[in-house]
Design a protein with these regions (language model features):
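Short boundary segments that mark the start of a structured unit
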Residues: 1-146
Length: 146
């Protein structure tokens, strides 16, 4: 809302005050607009675990700060010791958040093979947030296939 304060003039050297003119009320109108930005992206958790039964692993990206405007962030998977194309399908893209949207899921296909995998991992990384937006930790998360 609008902010007001009183301004008083006193001790004028070499000048005179007009009667009833030495005090004024100043009003600052709240007319600011929200900039495109002013928030951050991060993963909800730094690690996720998924069974090697096929299907998808889901990781959650959260948007913090102002959600009044649309914003976007890019993502991609990277191999740690799980093999892309054998254990999981590499994915990349851009998540587009609508106004007032604070979370989105990334689905990563997990591939079932004939080898019993235990503890194989890959990462999902966030990059390139919209102008004015930042990345918060964790901006990289590890998915472990058990």
């Amino acid at each position: 809302g609008a902010k007001t304060f009183n301004l008083s003039l006193s001790n004028a050297n070499g000048a005179a005050f007009m009667p009833n003119r030495s005090t004024a009320t100043v009003t600052i109108n709240d007319d600011e607009t929200v900039e495109f930005g002013s928030g951050s992206f991060k993963f909800a958790k730094s690690t996720y675990a998924v069974a090697e039964t096929g299907g998808d692993a889901y990781v959650t990206v959260q948007r913090t700060g102002s959600t009044a405007n649309p914003a976007s962030v890019s993502y991609s998977t990277a191999t740690i010791n799980a093999q892309g194309g054998t254990d999981f399908t590499h994915v990349s893209g851009t998540l587009s958040f609508a106004a007032n949207e604070s979370a989105k899921l990334i689905a990563i296909p997990i591939l079932k093979d004939n080898i019993a995998d235990t503890g194989e991992s890959f990462s999902v990384d966030l990059t390139n947030p919209s102008s004015g937006w930042t990345l918060l930790s964790p901006y990289s998360t590890t998915v472990t296939i058990d």
